[in-house]
A protein has these predicted regions:
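Short, well-ordered helical secondary-structure segments
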Residues: 24-27, 61, 112
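An N-terminal structural lobe/cap that precedes and organizes the functional/catalytic core
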Residues: 1-36
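Conserved structured core elements
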Residues: 42-45, 64, 68, 72
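Fold-level signature of zinc-dependent metallopeptidase catalytic domains
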Residues: 30-32, 37-39, 43-44, 50-52
């Protein structure tokens, strides 16, 4: 099916589609930088596929039209998450409310895009807040925690992996 995104599994969890060298086959290689980012990418791929199926059953759209509608819906959900979950955590609900009430202070286009200021500033700020590890799976390995090490793999196996304070 050429409008669904491929998602792979090694039998334990979903993963990004990969080539024979293990490189993710995705539009932006940065979305495979670490376990958590790759997991978010997989979640959006799966969400897109579910939306495609919903569009196909709820409308008469198929092919490129179904893909475009699914893309529009997924993009809207992503933007909703940024506005209602991400931004309030970083800039506070009061500033989000002010922007919604009084408008943004930059020129806009008719094309729905993420402003470059957000791409380069807010996401970089978010990257600086990353933890050294994330508990990634409690269901596998007889309930033992699996830590996805983001920085120092030598911390693997410790009950409380070290942080970045040195």
């Amino acid at each position: 099916d050429n409008i669904l995104f491929r998602v792979e599994t090694g039998g334990l969890f979903e993963d990004l589609p990969r080539n024979s060298q293990g490189q993710a086959i995705i539009a932006d290689a940065r979305n495979d930088e670490n376990l958590m980012i790759a997991g978010i990418q997989v979640a959006f791929l799966k969400f897109h596929n579910a939306v495609v199926e919903r569009v196909r059953t709820a409308t008469d759209l198929d092919g490129d039209a179904a893909f475009a509608e699914a893309r529009r819906i997924v993009t809207w959900h992503y933007q909703w998450l940024i506005l209602h979950q991400f931004l309030p955590q970083f800039i506070g609900q009061a500033l989000v409310n002010d922007i919604l009430a009084n408008g943004r202070q930059h020129y806009t286009t008719l094309v729905p895009t993420i402003p470059v200021e957000f791409q380069t500033a807010a996401y970089r700020f978010g990257h600086s807040m990353i933890r050294p590890s994330y508990r990634a799976n409690l269901a596998g390995d007889k309930g033992e925690a699996f830590f996805g090490m983001v920085f120092d793999p030598s911390e693997f196996g410790k009950s409380d992996p070290g942080d970045m304070t040195g």
